[in-house]
Swiss-Prot record:
This is Shikimate kinase. Belongs to the shikimate kinase family. Its EC number is 2.7.1.71. One of its GO terms (biological process) is aromatic amino acid family biosynthetic process. The gene is aroK. One of its GO terms (cellular component) is cytosol.
Amino acid sequence: MRNLILVGPMGAGKSTIGRLLAKELRLPFKDSDKEIELRTGANIPWIFDKEGEPGFRDREQAMIAELCGTDGVVLATGGGAVMREANRRALHAGGRVVYLHASVEQQVGRTARDRNRPLLRTADPAKTLRDLLEIRDPLYREIADLVVETDERPPRMVVLDILERLQQLPPR
């Protein structure tokens, strides 16, 4: 396996599950958003404010291309990474892709206090999350080797489920 790549909406558990998977597999963990912040010295909301979403997405595309060009990492992507076709191609080619699915209700609960999510600076975050999931869900599924539900499941249980199901996948 080249890399293990986690996609899904914000609040699905990509970073939490990714860190646990990396530890279990003895691989480095990378979060594309955190890598962008490290490189730029700025947080994601600041980048959105100064460069707009297109500017952030350009940075994200470059980071995903770089990280998918490596071998042997567990990679958590930002929720909107799948919006660009170039990213979907890179992610699919970069390794096994696991779509961590979470209901809008779970996403709302998990992101309610997080001020680091520019797209949720709206009057109705639940509606925003619903709208985003409606657009992005087919794109996550398009590139996923596995779809794993995270609602009401402890992270450790999700990790064990992923590891077991990865072993059952045919080579590609």
